[in-house]
Amino acid sequence: MVDHLKRQDEKVFAAIEAELGRQRSKIELIASENFVSEAVMEAQGSVLTNKYAEGYPGKRYYGGCEHVDVVEDIARDRVKEIFGAEHVNVQPHSGAQANMAVYFTILEQGDTVLGMNLSHGGHLTHGSPVNFSGVQYNFVEYGVDAESHRINYDDVLAKAKEHKPKLIVAGASAYPRVIDFKRFREIADEVGAYLMVDMAHIAGLVAAGLHPNPVPHAHFVTTTTHKTLRGPRGGMILCEEQFAKQIDKSIFPGIQGGPLMHVIAAKAVAFGEALQDDFKTYAQNIINNANRLAEGLQKEGLTLVSGGTDNHLILIDVRNLEITGKVAEHVLDEVGITVNKNTIPFETASPFVTSGVRIGTAAVTSRGFGLEEMDEIASLIAYTLKNHENEAALEEARKRVEALTSKFPMYTDL
């Protein structure tokens, strides 16, 4: 297939080859990224990309859907087996659209929702004023404690009692600690609210039984299918059976047309991988690597938000190094370490500058990195940030990155 692309469109082929080279040669620490299997990529690049399939298995608006029906049913059944969900919709094109569908199912414009502050670890779709969620609905924010940088559940309860939200959103995009979903449901029940959990970042850890499962506690659970779940880029919704018809209607015809059946096939393959015994080993290694990396960074004198991690994610506060998150992201990329600048709790800098850097261990763990490599990465990050204006030091860091990545070849058949 790549040979056809190379012959037909040299420019696109060259860009893809360059990206493959980047992924092979750099240390990927963006917490929301991962490396899918060749099987997942083959499914996504299959002839299913040709098929329109508006509707759901057995109830399509197009003919010729008998085979894509099988694929979608496989995907849904596997998710139910993994997470114990009563109903699953695997059609959302993204996590944002999954969240939108839940909002459209139970909220009216202007309804009050309680969600996590973006700079404290939340997500754009949890009420940011620049996102549809913050425009359409009246979001009230909760956050983390100023000292511990952990969610203060008493504060969440107090705000829930004060504002009487119709929906409470739990889950985060930059929160390195375990979230108490049972406590969130108790709070929701106390004020008569629905509970939605966005488990996008931790879905793979939940699938492996290494993080509390929100499904028994939440009315709705949304997630992406990539990140720690190691599938293609996409979303899905898990919910109680009582909301099944409403959720499905919110996705189609509510906010989407035809589903991307080639992506759903890739999702099904990834879900099958998540059911294998070695996936639990993989997820445990993600956590082990994150803990080791956090310890190494702290030994190097770096400050971590909340003092460490319980999952795959680490948030570094770079202010004591007298640099910004923007500078840190740039200089690390210069030596071959890919991260993203990120706001930290009680942020004072612009979101385009930030005081933090977010990193994660899902992708490097997929590549085969272990504890020794985490020690080297911690050393590399600290060395690079402390010497960010020293070109000789940066050149040394580049060589160390190259030495590390060369030991772990990836996608050798591509």
UniProtKB/Swiss-Prot annotation:
EC number: 2.1.2.1
Family annotation (PROSITE patterns): SHMT
Subcellular location: Cytoplasm
Residues that bear N6-(pyridoxal phosphate)lysine: 227
Enzyme class: transferase
CC per GO annotation: cytosol
InterPro entries: PyrdxlP-dep_Trfase (IPR015424), PyrdxlP-dep_Trfase_major (IPR015421), PyrdxlP-dep_Trfase_small (IPR015422), Ser_HO-MeTrfase (IPR001085), Ser_HO-MeTrfase-like (IPR049943), Ser_HO-MeTrfase_PLP_BS (IPR019798), SHMT-like_dom (IPR039429)
One GO BP annotation of this record: glycine biosynthetic process from serine
Cysteine disulfide partners in this protein: none
Keyword hit for Transport: no
Cofactor(s) required for function per UniProt: pyridoxal 5'-phosphate
Site-annotated residues for Plays an important role in substrate specificity: 226
Catalyzed chemical reaction(s): (6R)-5,10-methylene-5,6,7,8-tetrahydrofolate + glycine + H2O = (6S)-5,6,7,8-tetrahydrofolate + L-serine
Family of this protein: Belongs to the SHMT family.
Complex and partners: Homodimer.
PANTHER family with a match to the protein in the record: SERINE HYDROXYMETHYLTRANSFERASE, SERINE HYDROXYMETHYLTRANSFERASE 1
Described purpose of this protein according to its UniProt entry: Catalyzes the reversible interconversion of serine and glycine with tetrahydrofolate (THF) serving as the one-carbon carrier. This reaction serves as the major source of one-carbon groups required for the biosynthesis of purines, thymidylate, methionine, and other important biomolecules. Also exhibits THF-independent aldolase activity toward beta-hydroxyamino acids, producing glycine and aldehydes, via a retro-aldol mechanism.
Protein name: Serine hydroxymethyltransferase
Name of the gene: glyA
